[in-house]
């Protein structure tokens, strides 16, 4: 069959740029999960849960994201992005609504089940879908566009936090906040995901010739998940993401407390600071993804990790609010950059035909890093009552991680083993 050229401009309502807007809308709703810290104190005050108990729903949500991303990625590659995003969105919103039913201290399990398990799995399925879809639609701007998509996730908490604070101040039972939020998430995801679709067979961007050497891959590889798992590169990329996430989310989990301890600011100032820093998380996803299109993916990861390491070494000595803010902003910027750059990197290395399954499986790095990083940092702080040791350890981890992008190389095409498979063209 002859290749079909689709520029995406024949119908503006179904153009590839329209898909970017739809993807950002979905990611905004999903990124609201990072606003959990807003719920901590109101829930503690009303239900008398401990600190460890009140953060459990969020930890479970982060820990189960990879389940949804693996399942959703595999299913998406078979049935397309729309049903997976819609299904994930419904599960995510249903989890929020279930959490709104919690009415007593003994029902923490229901909050964990709704917000944590159902919400986390639904989030994972809906999160991976627009990333894999846009990687197929934008081979010419793969880094930038996937960065823009996941930037929506970063902005989700920034938008949700003030709304949630207002609702918490007006509702007598604090868990009721999850009902209107869940309904809002559902509407946003259903609206955005209803436009999702994969490009038609033979799709190509007029005038774009995939590079075969240099900084980007040709993208003509067609690795299945099983084939990708047989390469060391899949594990190298997953490790890069896991270590970067562990360092970044460890700081995010302690940012407000660290600002009060190191820079001696008030709790209110620290809360405002964390809200502003969230903008750099979102901005980093776009900036580093865009930059990686120009300087190369691995060079970008080296720069991100070195930047994190230097900031962690300096943070314990940041006695002024301005210096703490600048260093914290750079950490947030690098943390967001890992999420913005890795989807395009995975597509470069393993192609876009099975991008949902391949990158979906890599999301296990998010769950691993998101649990280990904050846990180790909190334990080290409890032992020393200082952030010097925790942040020094994070700096060492980031510096050690630099070795991974330095040694990681493109995989060779796998020998096809599927029945009726044809060899992947080599360039």
Predicted regions: what they are:
Residues 153-201:
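Helix-loop-helix hairpin linking two adjacent transmembrane segments in secondary transporters
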Residues 237, 247-250, 269, 274-345:
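C-terminal transmembrane helical hairpin of 12-TM major facilitator-type secondary transporters
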Residues 68-81, 285-296, 381-382:
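Helix-to-loop junctions at the C-terminal end of transmembrane segments
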Residues 43, 124-138, 146, 337-350:
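Intracellular juxtamembrane helix-capping segments at the cytosolic ends
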Residues 90-104, 307-319:
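C-terminal ends and interior cores of transmembrane alpha-helices
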Residues 36-41, 226-290, 373:
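Extracytoplasmic gate region of multi-pass secondary transporters
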Residues 183-214, 401-409:
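C-terminal membrane-cytosol helix-exit motif in multi-pass small-molecule transporters
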Residues 108-124, 242, 323-336:
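Hydrophobic core of transmembrane alpha-helices in multi-pass small-molecule transporters
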């Amino acid at each position: 069959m002859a290749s079909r050229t689709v520029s995406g401009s024949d119908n503006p309502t179904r153009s590839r740029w329209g898909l970017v807007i739809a993807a950002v809308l979905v990611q905004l709703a999903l990124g609201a999960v990072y606003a959990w810290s807003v719920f901590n104190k109101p829930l503690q005050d009303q239900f008398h849960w401990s600190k460890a108990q009140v953060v459990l729903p969020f930890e479970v949500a982060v820990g189960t994201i990879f389940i949804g991303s693996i399942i959703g990625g595999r299913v998406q590659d078979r049935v397309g992005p729309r049903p997976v995003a819609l299904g994930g969105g419904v599960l995510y919103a249903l989890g929020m609504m279930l959490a709104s039913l919690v009415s007593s201290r003994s029902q923490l399990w229901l909050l964990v089940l709704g917000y944590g398990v159902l919400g986390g799995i639904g989030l994972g399925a809906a999160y991976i879908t627009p990333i894999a879809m846009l990687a197929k639609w934008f081979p010419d701007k793969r880094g930038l566009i996937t960065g823009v998509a996941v930037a929506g996730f970063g902005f989700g908490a920034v938008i949700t936090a003030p709304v949630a604070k207002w609702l918490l101040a007006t509702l007598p039972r604090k868990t009721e906040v999850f009902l209107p939020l869940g309904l809002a998430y559902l509407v946003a995801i259903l609206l955005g995901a209803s436009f999702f679709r994969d490009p038609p067979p033979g799709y190509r961007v007029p005038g774009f010739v995939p590079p075969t050497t240099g900084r980007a891959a040709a993208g003509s590889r067609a690795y299945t998940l099983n084939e990708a798992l047989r390469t060391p590169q899949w594990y190298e990329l997953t490790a890069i993401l896991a270590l970067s996430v562990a360092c970044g989310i460890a700081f995010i989990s302690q940012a407000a407390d660290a600002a009060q301890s190191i820079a001696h600011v008030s709790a209110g100032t620290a809360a405002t600071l964390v809200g502003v820093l969230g903008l750099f998380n979102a901005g980093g996803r776009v900036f580093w993804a865009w930059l990686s299109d120009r300087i190369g993916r691995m060079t970008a990861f080296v720069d991100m990790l070195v930047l994190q390491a230097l900031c962690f070494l300096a943070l314990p000595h940041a006695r002024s609010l301005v210096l703490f803010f600048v260093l914290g902003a750079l950490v947030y910027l690098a943390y967001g950059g890992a999420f913005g750059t890795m989807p395009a990197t995975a597509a470069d290395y393993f192609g876009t035909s099975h991008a949902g399954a391949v990158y979906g499986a890599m999301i296990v790095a998010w769950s691993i890093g998101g649990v280990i990083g904050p846990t180790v940092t909190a334990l080290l702080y409890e032992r020393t009552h200082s952030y010097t040791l925790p942040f020094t350890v994070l700096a060492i981890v980031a510096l050690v991680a630099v070795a991974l992008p330095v040694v990681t190389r493109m995989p060779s095409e796998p020998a096809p083993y599927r029945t009726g498979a044809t060899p992947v063209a080599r360039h």
